[in-house]
Structure formats: structure tokens, C-alpha cells
Amino acid sequence: MDEMSNVAKTTTETSGLTDSVLSLTKRMKPTEVTTTTKPALSNTTKFKGVVQQQNGHWGAQIYADHRRIWLGTFKSAHEAAAAYDSASIKLRSFDANSHRNFPWSDFTLHEPDFQECYTTEAVLNMIRDGSYQHKFRDFLRIRSQIVANINIVGSKQVLGGGEGGQESNKCFSCTQLFQKELTPSDVGKLNRLVIPKKYAVKYMPFISDDQSEKETSEGVEDVEVVFYDRAMRQWKFRYCYWRSSQSFVFTRGWNGFVKEKNLKEKDIIVFYTCDVPNNVKTLEGQSKTFLMIDVHHFSGNGFVVPEEVNKTVHEISDEEMKTETLFTSKVEEETKSEEKKGGFMLFGVRIQ
């Protein structure tokens, strides 16, 4: 009987102890949860070159040429990550694609062109003082004017109407240099475009094709040529002379253009030289002349102009259109004067 009493007493004490522990655990639980969920500052994030700061803001930095370069403080990690991407374009142009936080977009793909107008120090200063995005948007606005008002013609542009058919000084004019129908090898695994010699010698930068010079694997020299497409996107090609086939070719950069434009055999590539009128605003350091590359896709019914052209030309905000009235009115005037003369529409104007 005493033994049973002792067992019961022990059980009661144990139960009481257990209840006490459980009660203590329940009381401690909120404290433990609060402790584990308390945000802790970390020197690293999922973004490259971004660090969290004590005040809740985010810092951006980048390493280049064996030194750390501070890019500034930003309100969000995404802003800091974008600043890192912008800086990497200028500082790591040779492998910028492998050092990015965000994939290239229709917006950011124009950044390399924008940065070419400035020195490295100027780009870094704009990122630090917060003016980078504002100036980049100005650059895109000016570029949209070029896209919306460019005229592709075979010779000097003259307005059909107006004061005695005077030459327009408000429209951008382009002169066709040459065109080429693509062959199977141009869009095949060789990853190169052959430029006919008569055009290469006349319109492309000089590269010697002297057979007596010392040979290399592909040519004695090469240069980089820069073109813009309809959307004013920049395309860079390595231009060289292949002695093995005795041909002038585009190599590096051409394969990417083929894939982006979905080029096929029999498509036509057209090359132009374009002039920007003196009274049209450009950014400091920008040239008044540039080269353009255009694509005419082949279909069963002939050649067609890509639909995205009209989309690109007309996708301009109302506010921008108000500031561009001077330019668009000239294009509309020319279009109306040519409506009854046949031809086709290209870049918003009628071409004979």
C-alpha cells in the first residue's frame, strides 16, 4: 500500500514537473519566435555587388582592375543591382554578359550605345549622383526621334511639295550603299557573311587582300564595324579578309544577328549610310553620320517588311509626340505628297 502510494506520489510529481516544463515552454515560445524572426543584417545578398547597410539602404560596389569601386547607396536592393549592371557594361565590356544581375531587356540593351558617349569616370559619376537613368532616358527619347523620322532613299532626299521642292533639313536621310541576297552558307554553321568584293572595296573600311603579305588563320587584320537596325539597336561585326577563300567577311557578331532577326536563305540584307541634319539635337560626342543595316524577309509572295517596324515607329508617348511635331509633320507632308505615286511604305514614308 505504501509502495503504491509512493508510485502515485512520484507520478504526480513527475506530471507536475512536466506540466511546469510545458507551461514554461509555452511562455518562452513567443520569445524564441521573436528572436529567430528578427531581421539580421547581412553583408551579402542574392545580387552581385550589393551589400545591406545599417540604415536599411543598399550599397553597390564593383571590382575591376584589381580594385574596389564604390557605386553609391540606393533605397532598394534592385536599384543597387541595376547600378552594378550598368557599371559592369563600361568596366567589363569584354564579358559583361557573365557579370549581370538581370537579363538584358528591350530597355537595357541600349545602354552600351548610351555609354559610348561618355568616359568611364563620367558613367560612374552619373551612377553615383543619381543622374544616370535620367540621362539614359533622354538618350532613348532622342533615338526614338531618329527611328520615327528616318527616310530611306536611293539618293538625296527632296520634298515633293512645299516651297519649290526644297531639300528638307528636318528629316533624317539615308542612302543605300548595297544589298545582298543571303545564301545558305551565309545563314549556316560557318557563322559568317560574305561581302562581295566590289562592295567591300568601295564601302567598307580598308583591309588589305595582298596575297604576298604574311598569312594568319583568317586574315592579316580585322576591324570592328558598327551598324544600327530599324529600332536603332547597335550591332557590331568583326570585318576581315579570309585568304583561304579570298573573301571579305563579317564573322564575330554575325551569328547573333542571324538568330535575332530569324534570317533565312534568300532574305535580303541592305546597307545604308545615314546623315543627321545639323539642326537635329544629338548627345554630346555623337556623330552626325551612322551606318544602318536592314532586313527584307523573303516569302512565297516576295519580300515583306517586318511588322515590328511600324510598331517601333508609332510606339511614342503623347508627351514625346508633342515635342516631335516639327519632325513628324515633315514626314506626314512628304507621305501625303507621294501617296498617288506608287512605291511602298518604309519607316513611315513612301519610297519609290
Curated annotation (Swiss-Prot):
Ranges where the record places region Disordered: 1-20
Sequence ranges of Polar residues compositional bias: 7-20
Protein keywords: Activator, DNA-binding, Ethylene signaling pathway, Nucleus, Transcription, Transcription regulation
A GO term, aspect molecular function: DNA-binding transcription factor activity
Pfam family, one: B3
Highest taxon, organism lineage: Eukaryota
Predominant cellular place of this UniProt entry's protein: nucleus
SMART domains registered for this protein in UniProt: AP2 (SM00380), B3 (SM01019)
A Gene Ontology cellular-component term: nucleus
DNA-binding region: 46-103, 178-297
Cross-referenced InterPro entries: AP2/ERF_dom (IPR001471), AP2/ERF_dom_sf (IPR036955), B3_DNA-bd (IPR003340), DNA-bd_dom_sf (IPR016177), DNA-bd_pseudobarrel_sf (IPR015300), LEC2-like (IPR044800)
The keyword Nucleus belongs to this UniProt entry's keyword annotation: yes
Any one biological process term the GO annotation gives: ethylene-activated signaling pathway
Protein purpose: Probably acts as a transcriptional activator. Binds to the GCC-box pathogenesis-related promoter element. May be involved in the regulation of gene expression by stress factors and by components of stress signal transduction pathways.
Family: Belongs to the AP2/ERF transcription factor family. RAV subfamily.
The name this protein goes by in its record: AP2/ERF and B3 domain-containing transcription factor At1g51120
